[in-house]
Amino acid sequence: MVDKYANWVSSGFGKSIAKKLGLPIPVKLKRYSEQKKPLGLEVLFGSFQQGRVAQSVKEILSHLPIVNYITEEGQIYRITEAGKMESKDDQLKFHGLIFDATEVKTLEDLKAVYNFFHPVARRIKSSGRVIILAKDPADCEDAVAAMANRGLVGFIKSLGKEVGQGIAAQIVLVSEGAERNLASTLDFLLSYKSA
């Protein structure tokens, strides 16, 4: 179906009128196409602690057709077959940001989530992806851990509104032992099929 408003706003005349009237100008989303499968998309992965989920996600990402980056102690490294190389490119933009917050147990631990996203939130490409992996609050040991994990839902909603530009922000609740089944979920969420 053709969106007449989007087409009108995309024209020079329509764009100038929309700006003067304060009307929203929709972002043109990238869509999945069998003929144009995206390869080599840059994905940055970080985690609060190196638990089972973080190890599983690193393994999964190494098998996807992406350029894999990790962050450790505030530094970004590119993962290659030879190992990890420090990334010196401050202008590098990412297709996806993935953060493993399944080990978050206290409200103070949520600072690690902020510390991961704050320096790179403006470095997400248009139609990019932001994914937080969190523990299901129902599986948490105590009320504080459940509150902290529930707070991640609010964080991802706020982040999604903040970054805009057609960027999809999602949270995946990971139950105990489900880290082995994350491959298809991450593959789908990182693809343009999930737009």
Over which residues does each language-model region extend?
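Glycine-rich nucleotide cofactor-binding loops and adjacent beta-alpha elements
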Residues: 1-195
